[in-house]
């Protein structure tokens, strides 16, 4: 029980940067754990694909209306180890610079606002440009 309490205490005292990184890594590890359990049980990736599909951002504006949480939850999804590795490295380096010059409190808002802006741009680009 003290292990869980230690984690809660560390998370409570962590900066916004480390909390964001911890959330991203925890979501990734949970999905990888489910994928590993399904593989060892002889199943396929159906459950993980369903979870990722439920948490990801749909490309259709109509589907976004029925899955609005995807605008926020997609920011924390990563497909493989290289994806999360490079995203966390970039978040760490830029996050340290950001918090040094603008403060710790503004990082959460900037992260979420940047993610929402990216979601809007993704949905617009997917539906406006024929390359997709």
Regions picked out by a protein language model, each given a short descriptive name:
Residues 13-132:
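N-terminal TM1-TM2 helical hairpin plus the immediately adjacent luminal interfacial "cap"
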Residues 2-13:
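Cytosolic juxtamembrane amphipathic/interface segments immediately preceding
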């Amino acid at each position: 029980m003290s292990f869980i309490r230690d984690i809660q205490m560390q998370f409570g005292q962590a900066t916004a940067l480390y909390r964001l990184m911890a959330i991203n890594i925890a979501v990734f590890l949970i999905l990888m754990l489910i994928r590993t359990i399904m593989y060892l049980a002889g199943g396929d990736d159906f459950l993980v694909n369903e979870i990722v599909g439920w948490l990801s951002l749909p490309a259709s504006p109509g589907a976004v209306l029925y899955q609005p949480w995807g605008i926020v939850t997609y920011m924390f999804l990563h497909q493989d180890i290289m994806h999360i590795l490079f995203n966390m490295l970039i978040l760490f380096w830029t996050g340290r610079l950001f918090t040094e010059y603008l403060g710790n409190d503004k990082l959460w808002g900037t992260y979420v606002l940047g993610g929402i802006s990216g979601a809007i741009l993704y949905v617009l680009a997917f539906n406006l440009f024929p390359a997709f």
